[in-house]
């Protein structure tokens, strides 16, 4: 047995590439919506690993699936297929518009596959010049050079040399702006139905319906990035289901594995038909371990018991945020859908989101930010109502400590 080296938060600063600024405590154990650090301090988790642990920490169904598959078969590569991947694909197809699935390991990989597919389809079916991608300011689609370029945030994409060409960014929820740049050279419009990193901003129904119509008019594909908004987060299995607008390609990750790395790209038979052996691939994508856990997660999440409880929990969070705001006048807007909630700070506290995060941690609560001005809550979809009540009391105490100095 390998001896475990003693590590602490200082170790991070010595050995990890300095691209993160993690909290000063190290979580070591989680159960449900509770987490404990190295010192045994307990936290209530409203962060969900950035909308990943949709069933909380160490959910029994996921632990059982991982344990059972871990004793059976770990990895084969895609030289062979495997039963968990085929079962998971069947269930995703049955639950959505899709006919075909591609599995990968992260949201960025799923989006990379989606963008490549969109261009390849346009070139094969229409024209070698049909390569324009229309995307949106403040979007986030991943960290590969292609996905970070499609994401509309220069702070993430600048500084790495030439970017992939023919990507246009316009304001989100602005149909006229899309129409102004849309033409027959457009291969795809790419968007998040709920912008996550961009501040928890939901698309309007009119916007999505209008974009769908423009895509149909110009033979362009509509790509929905549901990496963060999917798998029940919005109150439906995927957020497109709220709008009556069906994409041509959809990506999902984060909560798909409930904490185990896996992602998927979903599309139709017609679009998938342009791909042949070798046009895309991955070594780990669709591995038996990940797919077994994801199948268990999907089986639990895609039930009335879970999905019907999300709106009640949403209401409790919003009510508590409104109560805090009535006392401290700290939020200019409280928004979001289901259990992806954003609270935008007023001008007085603009830029202080991370200060509020630190105060929350000091009071035994894990929350997120979505940019410098928005507090983000993305808890377990099955979080206990008592945990919501206690956690929001801790948040109020944390907010007061910052506001009162």
Curated annotation (Swiss-Prot):
Q: Its GO biological process terms?
A: L-arginine biosynthetic process; lysine biosynthetic process via diaminopimelate
Keyword Metal-binding (UniProt) = no
Q: Which PROSITE patterns match?
A: AA_TRANSFER_CLASS_3
Pathway stated in the Swiss-Prot or TrEMBL entry: Amino-acid biosynthesis; L-arginine biosynthesis; N(2)-acetyl-L-ornithine from L-glutamate: step 4/4; Amino-acid biosynthesis; L-lysine biosynthesis via DAP pathway; LL-2,6-diaminopimelate from (S)-tetrahydrodipicolinate (succinylase route): step 2/3
Q: What does this protein do?
A: Involved in both the arginine and lysine biosynthetic pathways.
Q: What is this protein called?
A: Acetylornithine/succinyldiaminopimelate aminotransferase
EC number in record: 2.6.1.11, 2.6.1.17
| Keyword annotations from UniProtKB, A to Z | Amino-acid biosynthesis, Aminotransferase, Arginine biosynthesis, Cytoplasm, Lysine biosynthesis, Pyridoxal phosphate, Transferase
